[in-house]
């Protein structure tokens, strides 16, 4: 007999509003137009410093939506407003069908959060961390214990249930933080830099786990500085700079729209001389330190100019989301 899927892995019911304005629930993502997050013309200032400027975007139920931007772009501020922890100056935010911040407590009961830095109880065991966290959602001990085995299996921590968190590796702690965020069977997951600082093996395991959640109908709001992560996971994304939305769309569409040609990275010589050498055959050129980024529709012509030059090395590759990000926000360091 097939084992029944754990409750927290089943597609969650989503709310939508019909023409009468009444809230209606559907357990089938996509059966009706659904919106998990609606941010409409939101502003926020601290003193006389604006940090969010008329920002609008929607996150459809069941999709992974990315928020990208350099430090200080407003990602943390808008995330805090979505959670009801910060009040917008103007504009409206609706999360899972309820207005925020006025009914943020209700919305948060259906949200799981993975913060940028793990805030686990280090002296507790893995199991104890899950037990304690579940009580914040008014779950009984019996309810929590019923889902712990599935959560540990999901996080691949079945053999670490009684281990102290302080003895876990960084990747294990991150997986436990993700499992903990699922304790309340959330409809929406908010992930802040979920794989920063992890080695490639741990990062890819987290990505695989997140894709399995999306396949189950969960909604994910993701902030990250890892462009490969955003390109792999996000259905759509929004790029912020100084509180403004400067681009929005599907990753591959943004790559085609903003770049749309091969990229050749050139280094090992004077960047200004190299730029002048290849510029007749380039659609666009950027210089960062000692590296020249040449965007070319006909890379063969660029290679002809570079072949045989002493000390000069180059790498031709397809464009990626990092190229888009740096094209939009610039290659200068932003603190």
From Swiss-Prot:
Membrane topology classification: Peripheral membrane protein
SUPFAM superfamilies associated with the record: P-loop containing nucleoside triphosphate hydrolases (SSF52540)
UniProt keyword Nucleotide-binding, yes or no: yes
Residue ranges annotated for the ABC transporter domain, each copy included: 37-267
GO CC terms: plasma membrane
GO terms of molecular function: ATP binding; ATP hydrolysis activity; transmembrane transporter activity
Pfam families: ABC_tran
Main location: membrane
Compartments in which it is found: Cell inner membrane
CDD domains: ABC_DR_subfamily_A
Enzyme Commission code(s) on record: 7.6.2.-
InterPro entries: AAA+_ATPase, ABC_transporter-like_ATP-bd, ABC_transporter-like_CS, ABC_transporter_ATP-binding, ABC_transptNodI, P-loop_NTPase
Highest taxon above the source species: Bacteria
Alphabetized UniProt keyword annotations: ATP-binding, Cell inner membrane, Cell membrane, Membrane, Nodulation, Nucleotide-binding, Plasmid, Translocase, Transport
Top-rank EC class of the record's enzyme: translocase
Annotated positions binding ATP: 69-76
Subunit annotation: The complex is composed of two ATP-binding proteins (NodI) and two transmembrane proteins (NodJ).
Family that this chain belongs to: Belongs to the ABC transporter superfamily. Lipooligosaccharide exporter (TC 3.A.1.102) family.
Function: Part of the ABC transporter complex NodIJ involved in the export of the nodulation factors (Nod factors), the bacterial signal molecules that induce symbiosis and subsequent nodulation induction. Nod factors are LCO (lipo-chitin oligosaccharide), a modified beta-1,4-linked N-acetylglucosamine oligosaccharide. This subunit is responsible for energy coupling to the transport system.
PANTHER family (alphabetical): ABC TRANSPORTER ATP-BINDING PROTEIN, ABC TRANSPORTER ATP-BINDING PROTEIN NATA
Name of this protein: Nod factor export ATP-binding protein I
Species of origin: Rhizobium meliloti (strain 1021)
């Amino acid at each position: 007999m097939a084992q029944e899927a754990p409750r927290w892995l089943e597609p969650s019911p989503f709310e939508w509003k019909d023409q009468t304005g009444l809230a209606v629930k559907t357990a089938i993502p996509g059966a009706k137009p659904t919106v998990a997050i609606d941010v409409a013309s939101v502003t926020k200032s601290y003193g006389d410093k604006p940090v969010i400027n008329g920002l609008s975007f929607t996150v459809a139920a069941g999709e992974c939506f990315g928020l990208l931007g350099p430090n200080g772009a407003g990602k943390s501020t808008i995330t805090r407003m979505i959670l009801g922890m910060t009040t917008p100056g103007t504009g409206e935010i609706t999360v899972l069908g309820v207005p925020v911040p006025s009914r943020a407590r209700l919305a948060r009961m259906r949200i799981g959060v993975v913060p940028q830095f793990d805030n686990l109880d280090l002296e507790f065991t893995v199991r104890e961390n899950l037990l304690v966290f579940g009580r914040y959602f008014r779950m009984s001990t019996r309810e929590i214990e019923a889902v712990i085995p599935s959560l540990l299996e999901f996080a691949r921590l079945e053999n670490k249930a009684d281990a102290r968190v302080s003895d876990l590796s960084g990747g294990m702690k991150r997986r436990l933080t993700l499992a903990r965020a699922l304790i309340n069977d959330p409809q929406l997951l908010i992930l802040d830099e979920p794989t920063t600082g992890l080695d490639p093996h741990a990062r890819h395991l987290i990505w695989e786990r997140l894709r399995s959640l999306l396949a189950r109908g969960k909604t994910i709001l993701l902030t990250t500085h890892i462009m490969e992560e955003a390109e792999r996971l996000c259905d759509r994304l929004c790029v912020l700079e100084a509180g403004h939305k400067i681009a929005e769309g599907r990753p591959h569409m943004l790559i085609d729209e903003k770049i749309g040609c091969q990229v050749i990275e050139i280094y090992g010589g004077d960047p200004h001389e190299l730029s002048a050498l290849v510029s007749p055959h380039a659609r666009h050129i950027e210089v960062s330190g000692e590296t020249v980024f040449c965007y070319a529709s006909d890379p063969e012509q660029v290679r002809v100019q570079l072949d045989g030059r002493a000390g000069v090395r180059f790498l031709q590759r397809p464009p990626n989301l990092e190229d888009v990000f740096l094209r939009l926000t610039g290659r200068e360091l932003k603190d």
